[in-house]
Amino acid sequence: MQFIVQGYPAFAYTGGVAFDAKLPVVVMVHGAAMDHSVWQWQSRYLAHHGYAVLAVDLPAHGRSPGLARERIEELGSWIVGLLDAGGIEQAALVGHSMGSLAVLQAAIAAPQRVRRLALVACAVPMAVSDAFLAAAKEAPPVAFDMEAVWGHAKNSQLASSPVPGATLLGATRALNGRSRNGVLEADLRACNAWRPAQEALKSVAVPTLVVCGRRDVMTPPRAGKALAAAIPGAKLVMLESGHSMMVEAPRETLAALRDFLAG
């Protein structure tokens, strides 16, 4: 499905079901150098079980043209712009990694537009190492390898996959390797720079879910626990996975989201 957001086309996958804004809307936002397909397991299920799903491609990602945003504040504004473009008064926002920061920023800036908030593999702050930033700028293929390896628990790197014949590590490397020039660096710098005040986190008043991977080395469990403690009333779910839990533990991730969205 196509929208015009801030003057540019924006693509959103609807889970194989025609989008109906009269249903409860769920907006799903991917991480750095990724696209809507990271939500393939969860988005399709939700779309076939009573939700209007928009798994988006952020600007300069996937099927959405334009320039990559260099600040999380800009990504949060883009998400609100998507709601405006779709005539959506209020939605549940679900984000992974960089996408979790974007939806959190949207909830801070425009709380009246957010019904529920799910933060998957989130850390605040989301510090990025100098080596990773340098590789993204000077040697993107090396940075893509870093993201793929660090983004999965060790067992997922041994050809383990819920899909027979597939390798999660290879699929992630193929996906991030398709990203446009400079996008990974812009995404990582946006993550690294975002430092909201504790008061901003405490101001989040919508029902919030924080989903962590026990084996996540990019946004480790201690960061998820701290975030859940900082947001009033937030619920914490810990999965036996790494950073890419939507594909490493797709059923468990879906179950956590499904139960939370049902409220």
What would you call each of these model-derived segments?
Residues 101-146:
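Flexible "cap/lid" loop of the alpha/beta hydrolase fold
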Residues 215-219:
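Acidic catalytic loop of the alpha/beta-hydrolase fold
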Residues 22-31:
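Short beta-strand element of the alpha/beta-hydrolase
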Residues 204, 210-212:
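Short beta-strand/loop motif that positions the catalytic acidic residue
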Residues 241-254:
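Catalytic histidine-centered segment of alpha/beta-hydrolase-like enzymes
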Residues 31-34, 97:
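Active-site glycine-rich loops that stabilize anionic/oxyanionic intermediates
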Residues 3-16, 40-48, 52-98, 255-258:
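Active-site loop/oxyanion-hole signature of alpha/beta-hydrolase fold enzymes
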Residues 127, 134-203:
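Conserved alpha/beta-hydrolase catalytic His-Asp/Glu region
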